[in-house]
């Protein structure tokens, strides 16, 4: 397998399936394309690998799969023993719901607090739409951690939902955000710390 990704310091969408693929333990080749190059060179470099013209893209045999969530779903089917989705049906349904909410939502947090793993820690002056996103994240994390007992959103096993929220944890750190200011009951901040201690994330960060 070959996973085509963008700049590790910035590309949240590349990070998510990379973390999931690392958890499976399957061997893969990483093709890194530097983003934000001048003269549209990044797009030109991506296009031969990805029909969508976007990263990430996973090449698995004669398949090329674009989009981070589609890649993660493929990995969950390809490596069922890795438990990328919870075994329990209720936990699996809500973990999927959380991952999809992250996939399609929280646009203000994305725009106001872009991921940059090499940026110094700084406190951001957050507008109300971003605060609303953070309140929802705190609520979602606390609900799932309380319901399934943690330490991960679906229970005992780290999985796709956790991969999808790992970039959020980096944003909290980079921008000096305390989830307790947005309704966190204590579970969310601890969870964010655990995400940033995962060996998969530490390996990604080391390459940034």
Each predicted region: which residue ranges?
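Exposed, tryptophan/tyrosine-rich binding patches on extracellular proteins
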Residues: 204
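Exported/periplasmic ABC-transporter solute-binding proteins
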Residues: 207-208
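GST-like fold's C-terminal all-alpha helical module
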Residues: 102, 106-197
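GST-like domain detector, emphasizing the conserved glutathione-binding G-site
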Residues: 1-127
């Amino acid at each position: 397998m070959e996973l085509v990704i963008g700049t590790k310091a910035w590309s949240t969408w590349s990070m998510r399936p990379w973390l999931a693929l690392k958890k499976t333990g399957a061997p893969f080749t990483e093709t890194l394309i530097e983003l934000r190059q001048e003269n549209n060179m990044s797009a030109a470099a991506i296009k031969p690998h990805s029909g969508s013209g976007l990263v990430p893209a996973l090449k698995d045999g004669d398949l090329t799969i674009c989009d981070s969530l589609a890649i993660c779903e493929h990995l969950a089917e390809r490596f069922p023993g890795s438990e990328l989705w919870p075994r329990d049906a209720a936990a699996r349904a809500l973990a999927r719901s959380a991952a999809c909410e992250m996939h399609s939502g929280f646009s203000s947090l994305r725009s106001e607090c872009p991921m940059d793993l090499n940026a110094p820690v700084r406190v951001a002056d957050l507008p109300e739409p971003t605060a609303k996103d953070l309140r929802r994240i705190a609520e979602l994390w606390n609900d799932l951690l309380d319901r399934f007992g943690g330490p991960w959103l679906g229970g005992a096993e780290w999985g796709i939902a956790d991969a999808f929220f790992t970039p959020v944890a980096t944003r909290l750190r980079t921008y000096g955000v305390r989830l307790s200011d947005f309704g966190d009951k204590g579970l969310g901040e601890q969870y964010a710390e655990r995400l940033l201690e995962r060996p998969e994330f530490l390996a990604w960060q080391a390459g940034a």
